[in-house]
Amino acid sequence: SDTLYVLSLPTLVYYYAARNHWPFGTGFCKFVRFLFYWNLYCSVLFLTCISVHRYMGICHPLRALRWGRPRFASLLCLAVWLVVAGCLVPNLFFVTTSPNGTTILCHDTTRPEEFDHYVHFSSAVMVLLFGLPFLVTLVCYGLMARRLYRPLPGAGQSSSRLRSL
């Protein structure tokens, strides 16, 4: 997803350098905005996957062994890309261009008459693709911290024996 996003960056740089003038057409506007959000939310979910993988490695090391296989990782990446793309399909409907004097705007959101619907859509996407993954990441790191700060079994006995000597 990062590679596709990087390929779309020159058009966004041109758009903002030309003071918000979009000469590339509505279809390409939709495509570039889709790539932006696809990259954003795929990155969030991949960071969440990394957090869960670390949690499994620290808190459940034996179970984590079967999840560390390349085939599983490939399928998980494919699932992330497909889920995020599926959630963002409505963005292709909402994003559009509109004339603004002598320039054409490529809206990051939507046209004014669809804005209420867009707010509901983008709020749901934000909760599903940012809020929940962020919560999962926080829980994973909290559980890892608790596990790492817990004394090792038998560690307390050896230190008390040393004190008695």
UniProtKB/Swiss-Prot annotation:
Membrane-spanning segments? 1-16, 31-51, 75-95, 125-145
Biological process terms from the Gene Ontology for this record are: transepithelial chloride transport
* Gene3D superfamilies on file: Rhodopsin 7-helix transmembrane proteins (1.20.1070.10)
Any matching Pfam family: 7tm_1
Q: What's a Gene Ontology MF term here?
A: G protein-coupled purinergic nucleotide receptor activity
> From what superkingdom does this record's organism come?
Eukaryota
Residues on Cytoplasmic side: 52-74, 146-165
Annotated glycosylation sites: N100
Keywords, A to Z, come to:
Cell membrane, G-protein coupled receptor, Glycoprotein, Membrane, Receptor, Transducer, Transmembrane, Transmembrane helix
Localization per record: Cell membrane
Membrane topology designation: Multi-pass membrane protein
Q: By its UniProt entry, which SUPFAM superfamilies does this protein fall under?
A: Family A G protein-coupled receptor-like
UniProt GO cellular component terms: plasma membrane
Q: Which intervals lie on the Extracellular side per UniProt? A: 17-30, 96-124
Q: Main location per UniProt? A: membrane
Q: Which family does it belong to?
A: Belongs to the G-protein coupled receptor 1 family.
* Role, per record: Receptor for UTP and UDP coupled to G-proteins that activate a phosphatidylinositol-calcium second messenger system.
Name this polypeptide is given: P2Y purinoceptor 4
- The source organism is Cricetulus griseus (Chinese hamster)
- UniProt gene name: P2RY4
